[in-house]
UniProtKB/Swiss-Prot annotation:
Superkingdom of origin organism: Eukaryota
Record keywords: Cleavage on pair of basic residues, Disulfide bond, Endorphin, Neuropeptide, Neurotransmitter, Opioid peptide, Secreted, Signal
Example of a GO MF term: opioid peptide activity
Name the record gives this protein: Proenkephalin-B
Proregion span(s): 21-172, 186-208
Keyword Membrane: no
A GO term from the CC aspect: axon terminus
Localisation: Secreted
Post-translational modification: The N-terminal domain contains 6 conserved cysteines thought to be involved in disulfide bonding and/or processing.
Residues spanning the signal sequence: 1-20
Pfam families on file: Opiods_neuropep (PF01160)
InterPro entries listed in its UniProt record: Opioid_neupept, Proenkphlin_B
Length: 258
């Protein structure tokens, strides 16, 4: 009785896995033959797979279809594996080319060296070489990045320089369309020197006539004693003394004498 119970329990435990396999295979066969003239019924196929129905025509057809499809699936999986392997080999080929000579040297000298001190010295030298190689590879990548960054910075500087050169051209043209640069007048220089020497008095400023494109220097006012402004008859060399500058007491004395 005990053996019979154990066999029954093993059969019950094995049934779900067998059922799942049959359903998966029959479903695949049904999908492959659904557009054909005689599609496979997945329910009948699964029952025949479990030996619940006789004869097993649908299951035999499904087995023939699966045996025909398995070589192609295996070939496709093999091609995908080969592609992945080639990609990995190509990605790791460049560092391997540089490191391979050092590994060969290590394997060759492993049998020649007898003392552990020599082995340690050789291993340390190889480690330093490998570190230098990895540093050079990293520096090459960094140099490429820095070169690209410098090119971008150079382009930006050139654009900024062009914009600065264009700014004077965009200035507004004044007074007849000419923008001229005039030198400093000597009178301004002398006026500044006189102002510094006499306590801040600034000399006369040059006047500029801006409406015709001409720059003219206006003379300062003539310091005459009495200047007639309407006809220009009174001039500097006549030495006319005005009445306001005379002594008023002398005028009153003349009146009293009369």
């Amino acid at each position: 009785m005990v053996w019979q119970g154990l066999v029954l329990a093993a059969c019950l435990l094995a049934l779900p896995s067998v059922t799942a396999d049959c359903l998966a295979q029959c479903s695949l066969c049904a999908v492959k033959t659904q557009d054909g003239p005689q599609p496979i019924n997945p329910l009948v196929c699964s029952l025949e797979c479990q030996a619940a129905l006789q004869p097993a025509q649908e299951w035999e057809r499904c087995q023939g279809l699966l045996s025909f499809l398995t070589p192609f699936t295996v070939g496709l999986n093999g091609k995908e594996d080969l592609k992945s392997k080639t990609v990995l080999e190509e990605s790791s080929s460049e560092p391997a080319k540089h490191i391979r000579p050092y590994l060969k040297e290590l394997e060759k000298n492993r049998f020649l060296l007898s003392t552990p001190a020599e082995k340690n010295a050789l291993s340390s030298s190889l480690v330093e070489k490998l570190r230098g190689l990895s540093g050079r590879l990293g520096e090459d990548a960094e140099s490429e990045l820095m070169g690209d960054a410098q090119l971008n910075d150079g382009a930006l500087e050139a654009e900024a320089r062009d914009s600065n050169e264009e700014e004077p051209k965009e200035q507004v043209k004044r007074y007849g369309g000419f923008l001229r640069k005039y030198p400093k007048r000597s009178s301004e220089v002398t006026g500044k020197e006189a102002g510094e020497g006499e306590g801040g008095e600034v000399g006369h400023e040059d006047l500029y006539k801006r409406y015709g494109g001409f720059l003219r220097r206006i003379r300062p006012k003539l310091k005459w004693d009495n200047q007639k402004r309407y006809g220009g008859f009174l001039r500097r060399q006549f030495k006319v003394v005005t009445r306001s500058q005379e002594d008023p007491s002398a005028y009153y004395e003349e009146l009293f004498d009369v």
